[in-house]
């Protein structure tokens, strides 16, 4: 029995449905329905999958990049010391799996090697830019696949760049400005003053102000801690005013009274790494790991990656608007690009055919000329051979005639000799 066709349902618009989203009514539920547990589901899934964090450390050799990372995560990542004698800047990539309580973190640390050690430092930033672009390109290629698996994809895009500023000098070096200007559109930059214990407190604030003034005057975009979150607005606002952070790294334990703390022992006293009166290490750790890790990740995707993706798609010929400022669908862009590529392939194919036919004609002409040359040479040799044969035949004929003449002369000579002998013999007989 055939099923009756279902009549399409007609949705009657309601006045409330036509209102804007900001005018949507909020209703109080009359009972418990369970969707208040959605946040717990998300947390449980995230904990099960684990978290990942990718940090880029840019700074001169021996400035304390490895020590600060060890201090941040309170562990020894066992990194070898780098040499000062590299011909060019390189990158060292190391991945670690860390666990705190039941939360797993896959940490990738990318450190510059040989940065600032070359005489010519103009292109020192290029390996960093190339690496950042390569991670964006890898993610874009995965995203453009027909059969993609972004859930299982190991995202290697850098979430934050800790830029280590040398404590010596009165402001930024030209290399610092050049590098940050070339990477600020590709990564979240947090500047830190390394080995801040080398600067007195009175000079430190002046140094910070000089750095920030130079960053602003050169148009370098630093990462700003978000202030749109009610829970962290006040804290992030105050932290934005403390940039760049003055940090000191140390994994050594020293005794302060009855307590054991991480710090550095000096003849004049003890510097405690986790004492906010001594340095900004705790502020950096809290901002980086406790408060803004997710925002760093989000900014990497929605800001830096989207900029790279947009530029790459424009280079590939994709656009959202047509020539008449009309929206263009992806299918239309694809068909137009496909037609353009087909026409280009056809033109190139015709050019190749024309070049091929031209080469064939040139080769045929060359073969004909070579064949004619060989034929002429053959005819010449044939003529020479015939002339030589005729000459030899003539010489043979002459020799045969000479031989015949000699034979005749020999025969006549023999006849004459026999006649003489006979005559002599007769003369002798008469005389007797």
From Swiss-Prot:
Residues 49-315 form the Septin-type G domain. GO terms for molecular function: GTP binding; GTPase activity; molecular adaptor activity. Residues 412-422 have a biased composition (Polar residues). Filament-forming cytoskeletal GTPase. Involved in the migration of cortical neurons and the formation of neuron leading processes during embryonic development. Plays a role in sperm head formation during spermiogenesis, potentially via facilitating localization of ACTN4 to cell filaments. Its main location: cytoplasm. One of its GO terms (cellular component) is perinuclear region of cytoplasm. Residues 59-66 are annotated as: G1 motif. It holds the Pfam family Septin. Residues 412-432 are annotated as: Disordered. Residues 111-114 are annotated as: G3 motif. Residues 194-197 are annotated as: G4 motif. Residues 331-413 form a coiled coil. Residues 369-432 are annotated as: Required for interaction with SEPTIN4. Required for migration of cortical neurons during corticogenesis. Belongs to the TRAFAC class TrmE-Era-EngA-EngB-Septin-like GTPase superfamily. Septin GTPase family. Septins polymerize into heterooligomeric protein complexes that form filaments, and can associate with cellular membranes, actin filaments and microtubules. GTPase activity is required for filament formation. Interacts with ACTN4. Interacts with SEPTIN9. Interacts (via C-terminus) with SEPTIN4. It is found in: Cytoplasm; Cytoplasm, Cytoskeleton; Cell projection, Axon; Cell projection, Dendrite. The keyword Cell cycle applies. InterPro entries: G_SEPTIN_dom (IPR030379), P-loop_NTPase (IPR027417), Septin (IPR016491). GO terms for biological process: cytoskeleton-dependent cytokinesis; neuron migration; protein localization; protein localization to perinuclear region of cytoplasm; spermatid development. GTP binds at residues 59-66, 88, 114, 195-203, 249, 264. This is Septin-14. Keywords: Cell cycle, Cell division, Cell projection, Coiled coil, Cytoplasm, Cytoplasmic vesicle, Cytoskeleton, GTP-binding, Nucleotide-binding.
């Amino acid at each position: 029995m055939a099923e009756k066709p279902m009549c399409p349902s007609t949705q009657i618009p309601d006045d409330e449905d036509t209102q804007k989203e900001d005018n949507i009514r909020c209703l109080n539920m009359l009972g418990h329905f369970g969707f208040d547990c959605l946040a717990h589901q998300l947390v449980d899934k995230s904990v099960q999958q684990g978290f990942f964090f990718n940090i880029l450390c840019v700074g001169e050799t021996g400035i304390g990049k490895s020590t600060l990372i060890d201090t941040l995560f309170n562990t020894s990542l066992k990194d070898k010391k780098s040499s000062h004698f590299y011909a060019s800047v390189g990158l060292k990539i190391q991945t670690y799996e860390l666990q705190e309580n039941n939360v797993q973190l896959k940490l990738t640390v990318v450190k510059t090697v040989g940065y600032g050690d070359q005489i010519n430092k103009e292109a020192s930033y290029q390996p960093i830019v190339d690496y950042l672009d390569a991670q964006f390109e890898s993610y874009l290629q995965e995203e453009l696949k027909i059969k993609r698996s972004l859930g299982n994809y190991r995202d290697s895009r850098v979430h934050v760049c800790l830029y280590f500023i040398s404590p010596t000098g009165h402001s930024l070096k030209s290399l610092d400005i050049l590098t940050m200007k070339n990477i600020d559109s590709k990564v979240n930059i947090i500047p830190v003053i390394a080995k801040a214990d080398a600067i007195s407190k009175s000079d430190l604030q002046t140094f910070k102000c000089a750095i920030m003034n130079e960053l602003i005057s050169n148009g370098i975009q630093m990462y700003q801690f978000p202030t749109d979150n009610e829970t962290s607005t006040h804290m992030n606002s105050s932290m934005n005013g403390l940039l760049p952070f003055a940090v000191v790294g140390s994994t050594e334990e020293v005794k302060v009274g009855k307590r054991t703390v991480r710090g550095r022992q000096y003849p004049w006293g003890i510097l405690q790494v986790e004492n906010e009166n001594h340095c900004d290490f705790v502020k950096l750790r809290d901002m980086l790991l406790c408060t803004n890790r997710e925002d760093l990740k989000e900014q990497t995707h929605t800001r830096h990656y989207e900029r790279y993706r947009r530029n790459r798609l424009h280079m590939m010929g994709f656009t959202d608007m047509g020539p008449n400022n009309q929206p263009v669908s992806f299918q239309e862009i694809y068909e137009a690009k496909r037609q353009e590529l087909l026409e280009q392939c056809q033109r190139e194919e015709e050019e190749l055919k024309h070049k091929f036919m031209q080469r064939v004609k040139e080769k045929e002409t060359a073969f004909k000329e070579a064949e004619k040359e060989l034929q002429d040479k053959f005819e010449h040799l044939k003529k020479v051979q015939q002339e030589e044969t005729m000459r030899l035949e003539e010489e043979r004929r002459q020799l045969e005639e000479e031989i015949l003449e000699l034979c005749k002369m020999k025969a006549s000579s023999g006849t004459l000799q026999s006649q003489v002998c006979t005559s002599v013999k007769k003369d002798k007989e008469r005389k007797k």
